[in-house]
């Protein structure tokens, strides 16, 4: 669910932001009419140290990063290894560190953990991990236990390594086939990939599927998120970029990165990397 704004300023003319209707408010917890957002759990959050896109030597390792509002990092449980212990969804919250929403679970033994919130999960729902869990959104189990055709997310690449695949807003993979020791998944990119049947995955799609419809409306909103401007290479001097300099505009060069490497179409995958787990390429 998204909301548009009246074009009373240039910054609001194109602005489209999420309505956050799925999120739990302070009023819901306290029994009031407050619509204010929740603060994260103190024991599961800490302030991130901003790197400004620099590495340990102070060199820029990632361009166009810096500034922005200070962010609290929420510790999310990607392993989902508390088997057989039911957990109740206490809250569904916003997370500035990812496109999806997160849900705070309270387990029967008193422990609390954040997980990626699947689509449709609500406050008060009950989820559980491990074999024999129900096939409903938020429950986690190994791939060999999941029926064919079911949508999954937060998928491990190796058993017990924690979810690595399909974690962004609105994504889901589909269980396509099973063979001795392996399960074939159709990834959101269209790629068919085989994974060990002992890898865990969570049932359902990732929440906030309309994330791609968001329009920030102005450069300042991107700056609040720590994104700095991108300068075109043709607008630079020759000392700064291979595309720089020249009398007027010219287009007689092969597109290159600021470090002189050919880009736009050049294959970057390591030729020695194994493709035996990829059943079908996403581009075919």
UniProtKB/Swiss-Prot annotation:
Single biological process term from Gene Ontology = cytoplasmic translation
Q: Which UniProt keywords apply?
A: Ribonucleoprotein, Ribosomal protein, RNA-binding, rRNA-binding
| MF-aspect GO terms | rRNA binding; structural constituent of ribosome; transferase activity
| Annotated region (Disordered), positions in chain | 232-284
Q: Where is the composition biased (Basic and acidic residues)?
A: 240-250
Pfam families found in the cross-reference section: Ribosomal_L2, Ribosomal_L2_C
> Record's superkingdom?
Bacteria
One Gene Ontology cellular component annotation held by this UniProt entry: large ribosomal subunit
Listed InterPro entries: NA-bd_OB-fold, Rib_uL2_dom2, Ribosomal_uL2, Ribosomal_uL2_bac/org-type, Ribosomal_uL2_C, Ribosomal_uL2_CS, Ribosomal_uL2_dom3, Ribosomal_uL2_RNA-bd_dom
Q: What does this protein do?
A: One of the primary rRNA binding proteins. Required for association of the 30S and 50S subunits to form the 70S ribosome, for tRNA binding and peptide bond formation. It has been suggested to have peptidyltransferase activity; this is somewhat controversial. Makes several contacts with the 16S rRNA in the 70S ribosome.
Please report which protein family the annotation says this sequence is part of. Belongs to the universal ribosomal protein uL2 family.
Question: How would you summarize the oligomeric state and partners of this protein?
Answer: Part of the 50S ribosomal subunit. Forms a bridge to the 30S subunit in the 70S ribosome.
Protein name in UniProt: Large ribosomal subunit protein uL2
Q: Which organism is it from?
A: Chlamydia pneumoniae
């Amino acid at each position: 669910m998204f909301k548009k704004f009246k074009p009373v300023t240039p910054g609001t003319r194109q602005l489209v932001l999420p309505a956050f209707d799925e999120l739990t408010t302070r009023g819901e917890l306290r029994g009031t009419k407050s619509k204010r957002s929740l603060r994260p759990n103190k024991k599961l959050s800490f302030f991130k140290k901003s790197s400004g896109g620099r590495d340990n030597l102070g060199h820029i390792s990632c361009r166009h990063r810096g500034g922005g509002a200070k962010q609290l990092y929420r510790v999310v449980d990607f392993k989902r290894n508390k088997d057989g212990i039911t957990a109740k969804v206490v809250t569904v919250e916003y997370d500035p560190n990812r496109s999806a929403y997160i849900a705070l679970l309270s387990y029967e033994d008193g422990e609390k953990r954040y997980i990626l919130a699947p689509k449709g999960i609500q406050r008060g729902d009950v989820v559980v991990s491990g074999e024999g869990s129900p096939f409903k959104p938020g429950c986690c189990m190994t791939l060999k236990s999941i029926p064919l055709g079911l949508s999954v997310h937060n998928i491990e690449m190796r058993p017990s390594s924690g979810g690595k695949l399909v974690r962004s807003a609105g994504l889901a993979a589909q269980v396509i086939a099973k063979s001795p020791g392996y399960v074939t998944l159709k990834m959101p990119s269209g790629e068919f990939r085989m994974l060990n049947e002992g890898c865990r995955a969570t049932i359902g799609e990732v929440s906030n599927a309309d994330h791609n419809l968001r329009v920030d409306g102005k450069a300042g909103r991107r700056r609040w998120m720590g994104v700095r401007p991108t300068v075109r290479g043709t607008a630079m001097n020759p000392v700064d970029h291979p595309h720089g300099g020249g009398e007027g505009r010219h287009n007689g060069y092969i597109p290159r990165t600021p470090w002189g490497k050919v880009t736009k179409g050049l294959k970057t995958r390591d030729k020695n990397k194994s493709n035996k787990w990829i059943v079908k390429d996403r581009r075919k």
